[in-house]
């Protein structure tokens, strides 16, 4: 029986976060009324000329520097010729032979697949190129009985098309790459990453070949996948479709396909064109893009600390594990919040801060469906909660209660934790005499558990601790309760 190898390459369109379009001064705001953000250049009216947006170029340079690519000192804009109703010029301005970003790498972390018995692993994906181009408009098929409406607000919006080598071998690798790329462009501030609005979307080129064969199989391109789940589902379906087709004696044809998320299947859209079908040629209205070393150095000077470097720093500076550092640097906002908490709580509390961010904080964020930059608990407020755990004022259990109270009331005072502790009488009981009296009562009331413990049943000890904590409404110092119980039980 033939064993098949999957071959995947991704082309990702990241909408660059410029205020105006790539070749005109029209705004790029999402959600405006149709055709209210299109100027004569976007409409391709006679006599108008494109003017390149410097901000788009700088964002492309920033991306290239982040992935270790070569920034082309001289690159060319080309006309990609094809007809579509929402492309007024009859061509798209893109880059072909000489893109602005050449090469580069992105390292991905592929999660374990327990069902398949595959462990987690790291992989480096090589990039072919990243080039600047303009987006097309949008065809609107609803609300127009028997007709199609055209909205040109999106026409001319700057895109960075990022192309990988065909090096991914599973949907899991493709999704891991897409997530890493998404996190990077958002981290760099070059794209808002809003997949629902189409700011970040992927085209997947998928083929299969017998294991050991060097020649690639015939590929199908699945267009405009705007969620990581759709990307995974579309690739998995397409792989199954191609294998079944070949094993049944058929042939895979080179074509463009769309993914139907309701049916969870891909369907044919059109035959897939080759580059020569687009009749690329240099755009005579645009001069070659010349990028000097001084320009690159200016962009380099404004680069943020990159996730990989920050992850390593967190391990060395704060003593957190590599895994924890990876989670904490999954977004710039999360990393900034963590460092702000540690700055207030002290470096000695860095590990507990990391645990809280990955535990209670993340849980509450997921519950409310918000991101870390919208968290209602300030870094200073959380830091004080952690300090009160560290100095023995409250237990970890009470700390969770206080954190939830600050969150729910959206408190604005920095000392909210102390206010709530005093108002509700939540200070931890650490007085040895008071705790001994409570423990004596617990032992007297739970003679059976005492006998079971002395007979060697360790679970009975935990039950006694639970009773002591219950008697103090969770306010007893757990460590002291543990020590006093052991002492009294001999």
Curated annotation (Swiss-Prot):
<dbReference type="GO" id="GO:0006412">
    <property type="term" value="P:translation"/>
</dbReference>
<keyword id="KW-0436">Ligase</keyword>
<dbReference type="InterPro" id="IPR004413">
    <property type="entry name" value="GatB"/>
</dbReference>
<dbReference type="InterPro" id="IPR006075">
    <property type="entry name" value="Asn/Gln-tRNA_Trfase_suB/E_cat"/>
</dbReference>
<dbReference type="Pfam" id="PF02637">
    <property type="entry name" value="GatB_Yqey"/>
</dbReference>
<keyword id="KW-0648">Protein biosynthesis</keyword>
<keyword id="KW-0547">Nucleotide-binding</keyword>
<dbReference type="InterPro" id="IPR014746">
    <property type="entry name" value="Gln_synth/guanido_kin_cat_dom"/>
</dbReference>
<dbReference type="Pfam" id="PF02934">
    <property type="entry name" value="GatB_N"/>
</dbReference>
<comment type="similarity">
    <text>Belongs to the GatB/GatE family. GatB subfamily.</text>
</comment>
<dbReference type="InterPro" id="IPR017958">
    <property type="entry name" value="Gln-tRNA_amidoTrfase_suB_CS"/>
</dbReference>
<dbReference type="GO" id="GO:0070681">
    <property type="term" value="P:glutaminyl-tRNAGln biosynthesis via transamidation"/>
</dbReference>
<dbReference type="InterPro" id="IPR018027">
    <property type="entry name" value="Asn/Gln_amidotransferase"/>
</dbReference>
<dbReference type="InterPro" id="IPR017959">
    <property type="entry name" value="Asn/Gln-tRNA_amidoTrfase_suB/E"/>
</dbReference>
<dbReference type="GO" id="GO:0005524">
    <property type="term" value="F:ATP binding"/>
</dbReference>
<dbReference type="GO" id="GO:0050566">
    <property type="term" value="F:asparaginyl-tRNA synthase (glutamine-hydrolyzing) activity"/>
</dbReference>
<comment type="subunit">
    <text>Heterotrimer of A, B and C subunits.</text>
</comment>
<comment type="function">
    <text>Allows the formation of correctly charged Asn-tRNA(Asn) or Gln-tRNA(Gln) through the transamidation of misacylated Asp-tRNA(Asn) or Glu-tRNA(Gln) in organisms which lack either or both of asparaginyl-tRNA or glutaminyl-tRNA synthetases. The reaction takes place in the presence of glutamine and ATP through an activated phospho-Asp-tRNA(Asn) or phospho-Glu-tRNA(Gln).</text>
</comment>
<protein>
    <recommendedName>
        <fullName>Aspartyl/glutamyl-tRNA(Asn/Gln) amidotransferase subunit B</fullName>
        <ecNumber>6.3.5.-</ecNumber>
    </recommendedName>
</protein>
<dbReference type="InterPro" id="IPR023168">
    <property type="entry name" value="GatB_Yqey_C_2"/>
</dbReference>
<keyword id="KW-0067">ATP-binding</keyword>
<dbReference type="InterPro" id="IPR042114">
    <property type="entry name" value="GatB_C_1"/>
</dbReference>
<dbReference type="InterPro" id="IPR003789">
    <property type="entry name" value="Asn/Gln_tRNA_amidoTrase-B-like"/>
</dbReference>
<dbReference type="GO" id="GO:0050567">
    <property type="term" value="F:glutaminyl-tRNA synthase (glutamine-hydrolyzing) activity"/>
</dbReference>
